[in-house]
């Protein structure tokens, strides 16, 4: 059984938020996963859907696999780098803003 993978690095969403979406499509058929992502209201769903479409294209074009037989065999979200920003506050103080990123990896197979 061959697994085809695609990765989106430095996606502009936190890993915690993206994992909520990833848990919904793990071990589902590719068609069902696309339906779930299409009707989800989360920003991370759009990012995961782009990676899923990319890995489907890779499997079809590079390996000649049939899309109807494919399942999401692995999907995981790792934390990327965090950009640190400053928000000025009263009396010369500052609060830190953490702009988190994540790495989205989707693998499909039979």
From Swiss-Prot:
The keyword Ribosomal protein applies. One of its GO terms (biological process) is translation. SUPFAM superfamilies: Ribosomal protein L22 (SSF54843). Keywords: Ribonucleoprotein, Ribosomal protein, RNA-binding, rRNA-binding. It holds the Pfam family Ribosomal_L22. It comes from the Bacteria. Coiled coil: none annotated. One of its GO terms (cellular component) is cytosolic large ribosomal subunit. GO terms for molecular function: rRNA binding; structural constituent of ribosome. Part of the 50S ribosomal subunit. HAMAP family: Ribosomal_uL22_B (MF_01331_B). Belongs to the universal ribosomal protein uL22 family. This protein binds specifically to 23S rRNA; its binding is stimulated by other ribosomal proteins, e.g. L4, L17, and L20. It is important during the early stages of 50S assembly. It makes multiple contacts with different domains of the 23S rRNA in the assembled 50S subunit and ribosome. This is Large ribosomal subunit protein uL22. It comes from Vesicomyosocius okutanii subsp. Calyptogena okutanii (strain HA). The gene is rplV.
């Amino acid at each position: 059984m061959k697994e085809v993978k695609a990765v989106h690095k430095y996606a502009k969403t936190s890993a915690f938020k993206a994992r909520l979406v990833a848990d919904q499509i793990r071990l589902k058929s590719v068609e069902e996963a696309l339906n779930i992502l299409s009707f989800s209201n989360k920003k991370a769903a759009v990012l995961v859907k782009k990676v899923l479409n990319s890995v489907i294209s890779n499997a079809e074009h590079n390996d000649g696999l049939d899309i109807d037989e494919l399942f999401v065999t692995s999907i995981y979200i790792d934390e990327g780098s965090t950009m640190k920003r400053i928000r000025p506050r009263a009396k010369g103080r500052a609060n830190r803003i953490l702009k988190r990123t994540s790495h989205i990896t989707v693998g499909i197979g039979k």
